Amino acid sequence: MKSFEPYLIRIEEALESVLPQPAKDARTAPVIESMRYSLLAGGKRIRPVMVLAFCQLCGGDPQQALPFACAVEMVHTYSLIHDDLPCMDDDDLRRGRPTNHKVYGEAMALLAGDGLLTKAFETALSFSGAPEDALRGARILAQCAGADGMVGGQCIDLDSEGKNVDLELLREMDQG
């Protein structure tokens, strides 16, 4: 991962700036804090690193792809927050510390996930390049995260609880 260190530094700085503190409105401070708790909890950041690395590999400027890299990480984090909820996998720990709903409560965790999902699209659409590229990227992200992608995979996961799961079903869950 050492060769990806410059990417990781850029990603962490960009993620930190996406959700500045203090919140603009004191009434929304709890949801911003909850969003930051999970988004800035560390992790390998494989997904956003891949976005920047592929951009560079294709001859692009990784700095320009940073909004998309951050958006991908925000969608991933939102999915983890929701996946940890009692109505899903009911996990108590994530990345070595209490899950979002254990710290902030279920309602705030749900809002934090929703907030990260919408912030992801706001961030992706802040891309400074050609507007059609931003729209194309946002559409791809929506398709991958939606009912035919990640959400669909979670649905299959819930439906298969307590059942024998074969390799084909695991592939369906993974691919949505």
Positions of PLM-derived features:
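N-terminal amphipathic/basic leader segments beginning at the initiator methionine
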Residues: 1-23
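Mg2+-dependent prenyl diphosphate-binding active-site environment of isoprenoid biosynthetic enzymes
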Residues: 6-9, 26-176
